């Protein structure tokens, strides 16, 4: 962990606070159903930079539990994750956010994939993920301000950015995180040729003289540094026995988390993993009859 980890992130949050969110919502009738209403959302983040998201609100009387889909490492934003049943929107307020560079939030910066992970990585103050982390916090603030949301039942879901968001904003009650980018990155990347970590290998082959600068930047983002700040009940998705980020590799991260933690070993099946996550989230949020919101092919 960097010696000035806390000041770095406090400065990021202070800088973010200087920019009002100024949200604009637009009804999307084509994506509305009899059980949920969908809006596109535009709001401002650090920069200022204009972001995009999808907000879905269940029909009926709230407040409802909420799921926040933090920005992913992919170009396209989904309303809910591919493969998830649309009926999830009948039980939860859902908000999915595109961070800067993702499609619909790609003006003036359109990210490349691969490419986003290493954008500005040799300078901590200009690293693109400083802005993306601020974006994730801003989206979470927007969701929490919605009157339809039960603030005691808010789940942040995603990769590393889910854990980072919940560590930077204490209001998350539950977290589902699948580490992929920011765990012991410089040491683990040379052991794989799989993306996204191979992107770092590509970068350091091109710029080997920047290794120590990259290491210094990534010290601000390592999940082990964020872990002590996390108060939410956490579901951590570990890789299967073979991959780098398996249960054994993630043991130091689990040990650093102060709250209740469940570690789930991925079965490398979107069905099996998705079913476990849906049931875990429903149990935490007190959603009865979870079967009714599962995809038909999962039942």
Sequence positions of predicted segments:
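N-terminal targeting or regulatory segments adjacent to alpha/beta-hydrolase or S9 domains
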Residues: 1-36, 289-299
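N-terminal cap/lid segment of alpha/beta-hydrolase-fold proteins
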Residues: 19-61
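Short substrate-entry loop that stabilizes the transition state in hydrolases
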Residues: 60-65, 69-106, 185
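Cap/lid segment of the alpha/beta-hydrolase catalytic domain
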Residues: 84-134
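Gly/Ser-rich "nucleophile elbow"/oxyanion-hole loop immediately N-terminal to the catalytic nucleophile
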Residues: 117-157
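Hydrolase active-site cap/lid region
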Residues: 162-208
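Short beta-strand/loop motif that positions the catalytic acidic residue
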Residues: 229-230, 236-238
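C-terminal catalytic histidine-bearing segment of alpha/beta-hydrolase fold enzymes
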Residues: 251-299
């Amino acid at each position: 962990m960097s010696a000035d980890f806390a000041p770095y992130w406090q400065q990021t949050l202070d800088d973010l606070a200087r920019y009002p969110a100024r949200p604009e919502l637009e009804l999307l009738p084509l994506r509305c159903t009899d059980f949920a209403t969908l809006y596109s959302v535009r709001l401002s983040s650090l920069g200022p930079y204009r972001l995009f998201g999808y907000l879905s609100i269940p029909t009926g009387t709230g407040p409802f539990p909420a799921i926040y889909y933090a920005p992913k490492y992919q170009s396209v934003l989904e309303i809910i994750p591919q493969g998830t049943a649309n009926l999830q929107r009948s039980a939860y307020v859902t908000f999915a956010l595109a961070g800067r560079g993702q499609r619909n939030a790609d003006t003036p910066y359109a990210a490349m994939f691969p490419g986003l992970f290493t954008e500005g990585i040799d300078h901590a103050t200009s690293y693109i993920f400083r802005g993306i982390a601020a974006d994730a916090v801003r989206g979470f603030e927007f969701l929490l301000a919605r009157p339809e949301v039960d603030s005691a039942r808010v789940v942040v879901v995603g990769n590393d950015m889910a854990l980072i968001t919940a560590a930077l904003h204490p209001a998350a009650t539950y977290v589902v995180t699948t580490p992929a980018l920011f765990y012991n990155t410089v040491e683990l990347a040379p052991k794989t040729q799989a993306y996204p970590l191979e992107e770092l290998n590509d970068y350091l082959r091109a710029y080997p003289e920047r290794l120590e600068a990259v290491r210094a930047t990534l010290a601000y983002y390592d999940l082990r540094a964020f872990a002590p700040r996390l108060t939410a009940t956490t579901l951590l998705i570990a890789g299967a026995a073979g991959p780098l980020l398996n249960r054994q590799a993630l043991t130091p991260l689990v040990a650093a988390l102060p709250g209740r933690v469940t570690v789930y070993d991925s079965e490398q099946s979107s069905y099996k993993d998705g079913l476990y996550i849906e049931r875990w989230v429903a149990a935490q949020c007190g959603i009865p009859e979870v079967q009714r919101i599962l995809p038909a092919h999962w039942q």
